[in-house]
Amino acid sequence: MKRILLLSFLISLIASDMNAQAKRYIFMEHFTNTYCGICGARNPSFYSLLTKYEGNYHHMTVHPSFPYTACTLYQANKTENSLRANYYAINSTPTLVIHGTSKKSLSSVNAAVLDAELNKTSPVQVVVKETGSS
């Protein structure tokens, strides 16, 4: 009888663990350009918004060749920057891609958008370790 109870307990524990939801971090790919005046005007408010979500997102910046190919950060990494921009068919900056599926103009990203993403859960947990200071 004890073995049956123990087995039942273990099975229920495993089943409940399978239904657990892992925290979902917001993954953002931010397409911007150092020579882009609109980017220079919108990026500061975007970064200010992100301070409220510290520890809840992963952010990657990509510098495509437009609107200006003279962008220093594009020039430093032409191949990878171009590949990312082409993959998402990015044709203007600043643009934000969230979770690789939702492409938005940076001006349309606000607390409501980020809160909606944070309210989602994931059945799978992936551990990401960030290095660096920015």
Indicate where each model-derived feature is located.
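Non-catalytic, surface beta->alpha helical segment in thiol-disulfide oxidoreductase systems
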Residues: 74-76, 83, 87-126
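A structural detector for beta-sheet-dominated domains
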Residues: 129-131
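Bacterial Sec-dependent N-terminal signal peptides
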Residues: 1-23
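Extracytoplasmic/secreted cell-surface and envelope-processing proteins
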Residues: 38-40, 69-71, 105-108
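Local sequence-structure signature of Cys/Sec-based thiol-disulfide redox active-site neighborhoods
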Residues: 21-64
